């Protein structure tokens, strides 16, 4: 299923079951507190301008704003997510576009964040070049993602293929992600290879185990989920 079609179909169900922040690893139960930890990890301060690429229904944007940020912009490809975001907060600055075709209108940002959206882009070189070009001098990129385990065995490789079919998402290893951004001259200066140790993943576990209505829509055949939550700060 195409990314746009997937989120047009399922975003309302995600919002109902998991709230406004659709992420596998949560640093705190409430979006405001989760985003405060993200701010610390991404070295974001209230004076910064932030761009959220693949912003969902704006949950992270709202969390950042509740922690004092004023200049937050989001981009999503899903019309359904735009509508749901407007219901959460009519004043959210969310723009509907394929990010690779998005018109930045000359805007530049102190921080650009991608939360579990990096693997949706088919041309990573073009994505990374676009992101880097949108940074202000001294700007940084924060990525929170589901990364493939390194050196997967045959069963794990099969699981990754099943996930690709299900989500149309590429799960890169932490080493691959770090290398890809390094090719654009960006160095990893922060992050954790395994966020499961310091976050709550119970909602995600229930989801992939088929213990929720939304999970049962997704996981009738996936045998293994050889991924881990990781985050990266690139400068």
Task: Give each language-model segment a name.
Residues 139-145:
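Conserved beta-strand signature within the Rossmann-like core of class I S-adenosyl-L-methionine
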Residues 170-185:
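Short alpha-helix
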Residues 101-112:
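A short acidic, Gly/Pro-enriched loop at the edge of an enzyme's catalytic core
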Residues 125-137:
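A short glycine-rich, Lys/Arg-flanked "PGG" loop and its adjoining helix->strand segment in the class I
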Residues 57-101:
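Class I SAM-dependent methyltransferase SAM/SAH-binding core
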Residues 147-168:
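Short, glycine-/aromatic-enriched active-site segment of Class I SAM-dependent methyltransferases
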Residues 1-21:
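N-terminal, positively charged/glycine-rich alpha-helical extensions of SAM-dependent methyltransferases
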Residues 28-46:
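Conserved alpha-helix/loop element of class I SAM-dependent methyltransferases that forms part
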């Amino acid at each position: 299923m195409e990314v746009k079609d997937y989120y047009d179909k399922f975003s309302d169900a995600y919002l109902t079951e998991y709230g406004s922040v659709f992420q596998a690893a949560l640093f705190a139960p409430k979006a405001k507190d989760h985003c405060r930890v993200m701010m610390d990890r991404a070295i974001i301060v209230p004076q910064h301008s932030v761009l959220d690429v693949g912003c969902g229904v704006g949950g992270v944007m709202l969390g950042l704003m509740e922690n004092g940020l004023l200049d937050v912009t989001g981009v999503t490809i899903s019309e359904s997510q735009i509508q749901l975001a407007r219901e959460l907060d009519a004043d959210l600055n969310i723009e509907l576009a394929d990010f690779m075709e998005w018109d930045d209108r000359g805007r530049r940002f102190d921080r650009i964040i991608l939360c579990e959206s990096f693997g949706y882009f088919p041309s990573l070189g073009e994505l990374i070049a676009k992101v880097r070009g949108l940074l202000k001098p001294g700007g940084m990129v924060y990525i929170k993602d589901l990364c493939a385990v390194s050196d997967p065995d045959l069963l794990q490789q099969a699981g990754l293929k099943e996930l690709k079919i299900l989500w149309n998402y590429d799960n890169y290893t932490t080493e691959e992600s770090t290398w890809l951004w390094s090719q654009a001259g960006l160095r990893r200066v922060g992050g954790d290879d395994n966020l499961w140790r310091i976050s709550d993943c119970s909602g995600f576990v229930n989801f992939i185990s088929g213990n929720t209505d939304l999970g049962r829509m997704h996981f009738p055949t996936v045998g293994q989920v050889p991924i881990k939550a990781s985050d990266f700060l690139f400068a």
